[in-house]
Amino acid sequence: MPIRVPDELPAVNFLREENVFVMTTSRASGQEIRPLKVLILNLMPKKIETENQFLRLLSNSPLQVDIQLLRIDSRESRNTPAEHLNNFYCNFEDIQDQNFDGLIVTGAPLGLVEFNDVAYWPQIKQVLEWSKDHVTSTLFVCWAVQAALNILYGIPKQTRTEKLSGVYEHHILHPHALLTRGFDDSFLAPHSRYADFPAALIRDYTDLEILAETEEGDAYLFASKDKRIAFVTGHPEYDAQTLAQEFFRDVEAGLDPDVPYNYFPHNDPQNTPRASWRSHGNLLFTNWLNYYVYQITPYDLRHMNPTLD
């Protein structure tokens, strides 16, 4: 899928070097088709890196995807140039009267912060409430899953004693579910979180369908039956080096982190890690775009009624 982004976005050259089809706005304007409009609420500190990761996963289908980047934190960023944010990100006020086919809400390093202490917690709640009437399907990732479960279902914050970091095996529970179509019976995916997602808790509080979980009974992938919302508790978008960068950052900070599980060859941080989750990550996002967005969204977004009979 050619993703349509502003001509000057750094991800254009970065992804083209990987042979990813990126269509700039100037080129896309000559095609007489309606692209899918996908809004990405980027909550990660290193926004450019996160843009690259998600845009890579949104690029594997023949339809155009028109990407809009959203920010809700007005504080000065320590990790992303202000010029980049001003040039490529919109504020909520800019898009609140628009409709979108899809919304992705990224993770955030807020696992040990209480919800009400999050600087932009009111804005998160505002976006989720707005999305009910303005977005066909929303995909929540990692910390955003925990936030959405609290806002939408009243599930209290669940925090692990130790950070979960590494590459873990998961198994699918419903082999014919659309979101897991084409998945192997078991697959690997990276995690980096303090948030805890016991499958039993989600079943007790919600009517969400759990589609994949770990051998320990932690929910990994689940969704509403009407396909309006989907949740992935890990980080299928991560690059091969992302967990290593987080590990060495914590080492330098004197935090004495555990070596990420099942990640470095021979469990030795001096060895170069390899990504073992790329095919799963690509298939997950392709399925979401196809079955949860494209097949149920209206052609004319002005007539949005994002429900599935």
Curated annotation (Swiss-Prot):
Membrane-traversing stretches? none
Outcome when changing residue 47 to R: 14-fold decrease in Km for L-homoserine. 72-fold decrease in catalytic activity
Note whether Cytoplasm occurs among the keywords.
Answer: yes
Q: Which residue numbers mark the site Important for acyl-CoA specificity?
A: 111
Enzyme group, top EC level?
transferase
Question: CDD domains, alphabetically?
Answer: GATase1_HTS
Highest taxon in the source lineage: Bacteria
One of the protein's GO biological processes: L-methionine biosynthetic process from homoserine via O-succinyl-L-homoserine and cystathionine
**Part of which pathway?**
Amino-acid biosynthesis; L-methionine biosynthesis via de novo pathway; O-succinyl-L-homoserine from L-homoserine: step 1/1
Q: Which GO terms describe its molecular function?
A: homoserine O-acetyltransferase activity; homoserine O-succinyltransferase activity; protein homodimerization activity
Compartments in which it is found: Cytoplasm
- Gene3D superfamilies referenced in this protein's UniProt entry, alphabetically: 3.40.50.880
Q: Provide the site residues for: Important for substrate specificity.
A: 192
What is known to happen upon mutating residue 47 to A? 22-fold decrease in Km for L-homoserine. Almost loss of catalytic activity
Query: Per UniProt, which keywords does this protein have?
Result: Acyltransferase, Amino-acid biosynthesis, Cytoplasm, Methionine biosynthesis, Transferase
- Per UniProt, what does mutating residue 46 to R do? Slight decrease in catalytic activity
Provide the effect of residue 193 to K.
Answer: 8-fold decrease in catalytic activity
What does its activity-regulation comment describe? Inhibited by iodoacetamide in a pH-dependent manner.
Q: Cite the PANTHER family for this sequence.
A: HOMOSERINE O-SUCCINYLTRANSFERASE
Under the heading HAMAP family, the entry gives:
MetA_acyltransf
What this protein is reported to do is described as:
Transfers a succinyl group from succinyl-CoA to L-homoserine, forming succinyl-L-homoserine. Utilizes a ping-pong kinetic mechanism in which the succinyl group of succinyl-CoA is initially transferred to the enzyme to form a succinyl-enzyme intermediate before subsequent transfer to homoserine to form the final product, O-succinylhomoserine. Cannot use acetyl-CoA.
Know the name of this protein?
A: Homoserine O-succinyltransferase
Supply the gene name: metAS
